[in-house]
Amino acid sequence: MTQQAFDHEVDVLVVGSGGGGMTAALKADAEALDTLIVEKSPQFGGSTALSGGGIWVPGAPSQRRAGYTPQPDDVFTYLKEITGGLVSDERLRAYVDEAPEMMEFLEKSSPWLEFVWKPGYADYYPELPGGSSQGSTINVPAIDLRELGDEERNLLTPLALAPRGIWFAPKDLRLFYQVRQNWRGKAVLVKLIWRMVKAHLFGERMAAIGQSLMARMRLALADHEIPLWLNAPMTELLTDVDGNVVGAVVEREGRPTRIRARRGVVLASGGFDHDMAWRREYLPELEKDWSFGNPASMGDGIRAGEKVGASTDLLDEAWWFPAMCWPDGRLQFMLNERMMPSQFVVNGAGKRFINEAAPYMDFAHAMIAGQRTGVAHIPCWLV
């Protein structure tokens, strides 16, 4: 229970400035609700800005425009198959029905939110009932970060940046790995060289995938004049005498600010990627940080939610991805590298333990399961 004295009032308070938080804010604004986003770090974008920027939405408008519309019942069958009973039919149906509407809403909310679909990036299990070799991953086009103006410096960027002018769309990356095999791979190489030339001649600062997605979402927020407070961590959720959440305490400019949220607080502050004590509690097999996620992700929102009675699930899960760690500590995704011919992956006993081209979640699950047997699988070795 808290005393009802507030320094600031809004209808909806969104905690976190990644893709989920910004989407929630745009929707609240569309419902004529006074909305505020608060972000713990000095930069916006969260883990979404560091990601591949793909959104799996069968039946999205960009798919329909290309003349391909997966059948909702097939999509439901596929999701039910791959989730193995962990998700209710009601929730699966909601995703199948509402995700395309979400994409349609975003496209209509701002001209910056442009989405494209390219066939051929297959579902992870296209052989299963309802799976598709065409795929349903939706992306955004590249964008010149100069469009952000002064906000460009506030976009969270990856630790390992490509040389100036080098950026990959998802399809570019797949073809680039064929550079020694066919003309399509060589064409991508020529394209990359031309991008470097343009960057140096004209000052372009092009960005793709997650960087482009979050730049576009930030521009959409600006279109709607939705305020975003940076360097403003949420430290506590406030409740009334009945235990209902009525707002939050946010640290701003060195002092606590009590914010009333008349219609609710949206927690979109990410996971606990870099809280090693908490991670070891759920997955002791992982001894080091090794996370690509937002450096500010320490589980603050989850803890605050638990304190007011929120339930949690799947805290032992993550978006797993095998990676290589350079001597200086930088991490590099291992996506196409695992699928190249004439190479294989072995554990500490020198034995293969999985199909190298398996989906990255399956690959990492196999590493964790193998580590529990007492044979080293973390790390494993690419031969």
Task: Tell what function each PLM region has.
Residues 166-175, 322-383:
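FAD cofactor-binding and catalytic pocket of flavoenzymes
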Residues 230-244:
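A conserved short coil-to-beta-strand element within the FAD-binding core of flavoproteins
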Residues 1-12, 30, 215:
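Extreme N-terminal leader/targeting segments of oxidoreductases
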Residues 202-211, 223, 252-328, 332:
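Glycine-rich loop(s) and the adjacent beta-strand/alpha-helix scaffold that form part
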